[in-house]
Curated annotation (Swiss-Prot):
The gene is rpsB. This is Small ribosomal subunit protein uS2. Gene3D superfamilies: Glucose-6-phosphate isomerase like protein, domain 1, Helix hairpin bin. One of its GO terms (biological process) is translation. Signal peptide: none annotated.
Length: 258
C-alpha cells in the first residue's frame, strides 16, 4: 500500500484539530491556521511525517520486531483492534493497565491464568468444579480477555508502539519512554509532540481519520513482514476502499470529542 495521500487526509478530516482554546503551544509548528475556532493542521507536514513513521514501522517488522497498537478511546477501539489482528500484531483497546510493559512479568502471569482458564473451558475440564465456581471463572476469563486479549501471545516486549491520542494514553507513553520503546503516534493539536519519536500530526478523534491511520500502519507492518523471511505475512482479507468524501462540518464536530 502506498503512503497516505493528501486527498485521503482531506476526505477523512485529518486536518481538523481541537478548539483553539484547548491547544498545546508545542504543536504550533504543525498548525496551518484556524477556522471557526478550530485549529487546522498542516497536512503537508502530515504527509511528510507519516512517510517517516510508515518506513520506521516497516523496518521494525522487517527486522523481526513486533508492534503494539494502542487506542482505548471509543472511536479507536474497533479499527485499532481489527487492524492489529489483521497483521498479527499486538493491541490494547479496552484500557491500559499500569505496568503492562514496565511490569510485564507480572502481567504475563495474568495472561497465563487466562490461557489456562480458556483451555479448561475448551477441553471440558472446567466441569469438575462446582457450577458457582464455573460461573465465577467464566467472568474472570471474560474480564482478562477484555484487558489482555490483544497481548495474549506477547512473550516479550514490543519493539515499537503505535498510539492513537498520546494525551489520553499518557501511561502507555510513559512506559514506552522508560523502556526505550520508540513511539509512533497520531498527535492532535492538544497533545505534546516532544514525548513522541515519530509524530503524525492529525485528527485523533474522527473515526474515519483513525481508520485511515490504523489501516495504513497495519499495511506498513505487512510490508515489513514480506521483507523478512522469518515473519509470515498475513493475507489482506479486506482491501481497504478509498475514503468517501466527508462533510467538513460533520468531521469538525467529531474533533470535539474525547
Amino acid at each position: 500500500m502506498p503512503y497516505v495521500t493528501m486527498k485521503q487526509l482531506l476526505e477523512t478530516g485529518v486536518h481538523f484539530g481541537h478548539q483553539t482554546r484547548r491547544w498545546n503551544p508545542k504543536m504550533r509548528p504543525f498548525i496551518f491556521g484556524a477556522r471557526n475556532g478550530i485549529h487546522i493542521i498542516d497536512l503537508q507536514q502530515t504527509v511528510k511525517l507519516y512517510q517517516k513513521a510508515h518506513d520506521f514501522i516497516s523496518n521494525v517488522v522487517a527486522g523481526g520486531g513486533r508492534v503494539i497498537f494502542v487506542g482505548t478511546k471509543r472511536q479507536a477501539q474497533e479499527s485499532v483492534k481489527k487492524e492489529a489482528e489483521r497483521v498479527g500484531q499486538f493491541s490494547v483497546t479496552n484500557r491500559w493497565m499500569g505496568g503492562m510493559l514496565t511490569n510485564f512479568q507480572t502481567i504475563k502471569k495474568s495472561i497465563d491464568r487466562m490461557k489456562t482458564l480458556e483451555r479448561m473451558f475448551e477441553d471440558g475440564s472446567i466441569k469438575r468444579f462446582p457450577k458457582k465456581e464455573i460461573v465465577m471463572m467464566g467472568r474472570e476469563v471474560a474480564k482478562l480477555n477484555d484487558n489482555l486479549g490483544g497481548i495474549k501471545h506477547m512473550d516479550r516486549l514490543p519493539q515499537a508502539a503505535f498510539i492513537i491520542d498520546p494525551k489520553r494514553e499518557e501511561i502507555a507513553v510513559q512506559e514506552c519512554r522508560k523502556l526505550g520503546i520508540p513511539i509512533v503516534a497520531v498527535v492532535d493539536t492538544n497533545c505534546d509532540p516532544d514525548v513522541i519519536d515519530y509524530v503524525i500530526p492529525g485528527n485523533d478523534d474522527a473515526i474515519r481519520a483513525i481508520k485511515l491511520f490504523a489501516a495504513s500502519i497495519a499495511e506498513a507492518c505487512m510490508e515489513g513482514a514480506a521483507q523478512n523471511k522469518d515473519v509470515e505475512p498475513v493475507a489482506d482479507k479486506d482491501e481497504k476502499p478509498e475514503a468517501a468524501p466527508v462533510d467538513e462540518a460533520e468531521t469538525a464536530t467529531e474533533t470535539t470529542g474525547e
